[in-house]
Amino acid sequence: MKEIVQKTDPATFEIVKNSFYKIAEEMRVVLAKTAYSPLLKSAGDYSCGVFEARGEMVAQGPDLPIHLGSMPDAVRAIVAVFGSDVHDGDVFIHNDPYFGGSHLPDVNVVRPAFCSDRLLGYTCLRAHWPDIGSATPGSYGAVTQIFGEGLRLPPLRLISGGVLNTDLEKLILANVRTPDERKGDLAAQLAATLRATERLKILARRYGSAKLIGYMAQVMDYSERMMRATLMELPDGLGTFEDFCDGDGIADDASGADAQFRIRVSVQKIADRLIVDFAGTDSQVKGPMNAPLSVTASGVYCGLKTAIDPNNLTPPNSGCWRAIQIRAAKGLVVNAEFPAPVVYANHEISHRVADMVMGALANFMPEQVMACSQGTSAILTLGGVDPRNGRHYVSYETIKGGFGARPNKDGINCIASGISNTMNTPVEILEMAFPVRVEAYEVNPDSGGAGRYRGGCGAKRVWRMLDGADATGALCMERMTSPPFGLRGGRVGAAAMVTLTTPDGITRLLPSK
């Protein structure tokens, strides 16, 4: 096949490149203004992206780094299943962690973009639904197979030629606790992806479809060149790091103890490439702390890009990661095999991996990394019937801890760190939407690890259920038995802790899951 070389002047390239990223940003704005659930419209637990026709990511919005590695797999799943059977006006949906997803609550809406019957690429919006079924409100439960984690959607055609498959929509909504809210969130995802495809059509009419497709390839190639050039300026070396997760949420003995398990990583830098190897990591576990490889990859990419490109000069897309090779045998906790449960691992393992990559890099480029951050998404879900209106509710919150100490300054208090980029749900919105009252939300003093530069302090938050409120809760946390580590002689940060006080006044410590 004869290679076609497209010549582009630098000014036009910058305009088109930035247009792709602005399209992803506009998707974010549309979703935030139209979503129903506080988790989406206030906390921002979603990611938006523009993809070329094979499913490679051309541009990601300023969203969640946790999705860097797995969103391209989500779009590639659509390409693999439907091939050329993709038409203007179609929309696809899926959430299968073993088919390009991350965990079941993260629902992918994928819409192809056409101009004059030519496929330009895809837009994808991954949004965390506060509930996707299962026995536990919020879909976070200590189960031993993925079948217990909620409704699992393989790649499906939700809209065909502009016509909604209402039977599929009814099936989805029948399996969640808050169907009206989920219907509104799904509509917001559809609106955002539609806006993005319309923007791509405008670009195609301006520059021509063939040239626009060529620009997509050039943007990814540009990121690859930038990443490799940055790597060439850094020292070669090999570093290893080992850490232990608190457990998988499944009791391992009669006393209810939850055994730790090990993750081991080595990072080797050779010229303009990196090899990340998880040899020595424990096998997949019984509970939902098993990560699909794409989730692990997200943690790797986040940790590496933060260290190597701290000023974000390299546009994040699939081109960035061509210089990075990830090795992880199937069946490890970082490359789980079906039907292992995965819901906790999406954020807890990727948090862990991102911090551990920094720990490994500290062996040969210590001035590029920071110490361990809070190292967990610290999730609390509550669900039941709201006594104020008699309706089912599901609340899903992530609590912000501290940012790790940096080579030349302290960490930041109470901020999303590592693989996360979500915001606090404002207390006023939380109390309006759910039958809870937040009695305290404050910095936990002296909780950051001590050192020449201290780690950021964590947060203390106190919830009280309103009188008459029916609530079933679930926790998903790490760093209770394995506190955030320091680097280069820095001390560990404070361990996480959760207590429950019942109406009779008795207070007890809760496990991490």
Residue spans for each PLM region:
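Glycine/proline-enriched, intrinsically flexible loops and inter-domain linkers
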Residues: 1-88, 93-513
